[in-house]
Structure formats: structure tokens, C-alpha cells
Amino acid sequence: MNCSRNDVVLLPIPFSDLTSHKVRPAIVVGHAPDPRDLFVVPIPSRLQQATFPLRDWKACGLNVPSAVKGQLATVESRLIRRVTGHLGKADATQLDHHLRRWLGLQD
């Protein structure tokens, strides 16, 4: 599926024991060197598991208040089930700030 940066997507996330999976939302933050892969950041609905809450979660196509988890994953783009929405400007700016901090790219 064709996705862009800051798209909110649904994709299967495996359980830690790898016996099953559940479809969960994530934010596309970039394309990996392999064109079949994407970098994503998970969106948990449990706010206590997250780094910062999404201000405009409804525009992201989410059903409940949600947040961004400080975790980066690489996924195959073929696993994307659908695009549900797109981050608003304020949420995208906050995500960019946190990505730079998580990756040690701040001046």
C-alpha cells in the first residue's frame, strides 16, 4: 500500500509470544532503505503507555483518545491494512521533536 509520512495506518502487530496478532494503529514516519519497508511508531489507546497524547486523534481516524508510544519499528508495507487518517500539524510537529530526541539528533 502507498503511504506517506504522518499517515495513520492499521497493521497487524504480533503478540510478544508470536502466537497471534492484533490489528493496531501506527504512524508512518518514513521509508526504510528497502522500498518494501516502512518505519512506524505505534499508537496505543492506553495513555499511560505513551510518550505524548494526540491532540487531534479524531482526524487520525481513531475511535478513542490515543497517544504516541516512544518506539520505532520497521514493517513491510504489504502488511498495511488501510490508511485511517493523517496527523495534524501540531501533532506532527510534536512527533518530529520526539523523534529527534529519541534518535539523539538534537543540537
Mark where each language-model region is.
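Conserved functional hotspots at enzyme active or ligand-binding sites that engage polyanionic ligands
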Residues: 1-107
